[in-house]
Amino acid sequence: PGHKDFAEDTFRTLTAVDSVIVVIDVAKGVEEQTEKLVEVCRMRNIPMIVFINKLDREGKDAFDLMDEVEQKLKLRVTPLSFPIGMGYDFKGIYNIWEKNINLFEGDSRKNIEETIAFNDINNPELEKIIGEKPANKLREELELIEEVYPTFSIDEYLTGELQPVFFGSALNNFGVRELLDCFIEIAPTPRAKESDTRLVKPEEEKLSGFVFKIHANMDPKHRDRLAFVKIVSGTFEKNKPYLHVRQGKNMKFSSPNAFFAERKEIV
């Protein structure tokens, strides 16, 4: 996120991730904090995907936003999905990656789960589905994309030379499936991690990991501290002794937690 309130926590988390999704507000565009965070990603060679959010609201033109991302964040982008309209006129997303259309039901603001395949964007059925004017505009936009933006390459994405762009509305869970389906397909597998003595590879059997942040007093009933650990290799098991390298002693963890947003559960 681009807001400065997220800054400190996000900087710490970037030491533990293998890939990143950069979220851009369609109305605000690139925010100051986004520029700083993207620079950290660039320094750490972390592959990035851009998600332009809140398409159900009025905002900047899609092409203007991609230009802004390229100029302010110094990224080389190519869209893998593209919006059909915006705000009140938002009709859905054309998935360039899979060549289909996902319609947005404007009145109820609900995602229509069924997608419509369009291998040929010149198919006259398109007018019946989204209307003549939006269909012609979409064809012109896709033609412009093909002429102006580079063809997507997974290798260039993984090396940080090219960043794919997706559009949608996270609040309405719209356009997110396209993003995540592609993410699963192209995102890198866990990378090796340099320790003080050697390079630790993820396929090694012995467990190794590192603490990337510590939170205190997360439970108001207790003066607790939680250490967040990135697993680098092996499999973690509770109640099994593990060596704390800095202290040089074994430690057991009887109630390790896994977090998903605000929800936590014992592993």
Regions found by a protein language model. Name each.
Residues 1-267:
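Structural and coupling elements of P-loop NTPases
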